[in-house]
């Protein structure tokens, strides 16, 4: 949240265009040159301005959005992990599973199961 509020207050307009592209379609971002092009900047200048505006590199920001969306979908829907992997731009479901486990600490299926167990427990407390 702090990254989101800081970004909202101080983003260079060119970086804002790239951030919107990442948030709207993280699976469509296949390389950083694409984001630099959206921002209308050279790759080197884009990296410099992006990091100065957000505090992180474009790749780190993309990965943060991918984790955020993966967690949201894993806990709030029954979308298959293969479909989620495609939506987020991973070349294979195995790559997505490794990425998720490395960033979240559990496999997507284990995370979904535990989060749903928590939701059932919350319901029982009411």
What is each residue range found by the language model?
Residues 1-24, 34-37:
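An amphipathic alpha-helical interaction segment
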Residues 1, 45, 94:
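N-terminal/domain-start segments enriched in small and hydrophobic, helix-friendly residues
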Residues 36, 45-48:
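Short acidic/polar alpha-helix capping motifs at helix-coil junctions
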Residues 20, 24, 29-34, 41, ...:
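Terminal helix-turn-helix DNA-binding modules in bacterial transcription factors
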């Amino acid at each position: 949240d702090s990254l989101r509020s800081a970004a909202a207050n101080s983003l260079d307009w060119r970086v804002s265009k790239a951030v919107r592209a990442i948030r709207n379609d993280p699976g469509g971002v296949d390389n950083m040159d694409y984001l630099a092009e959206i921002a209308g900047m050279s790759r080197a200048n884009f990296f410099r301005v992006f990091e100065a505006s957000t505090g992180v590199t474009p790749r780190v920001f993309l990965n943060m959005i991918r984790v955020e969306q993966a967690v949201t979908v894993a806990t709030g829907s029954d979308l298959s992990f293969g479909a989620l992997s495609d939506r987020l731009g991973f070349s294979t479901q195995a790559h997505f599973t490794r990425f998720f486990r490395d960033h979240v600490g559990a496999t997507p299926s284990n995370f979904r199961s535990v989060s749903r167990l928590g939701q059932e427990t919350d319901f029982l407390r009411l």
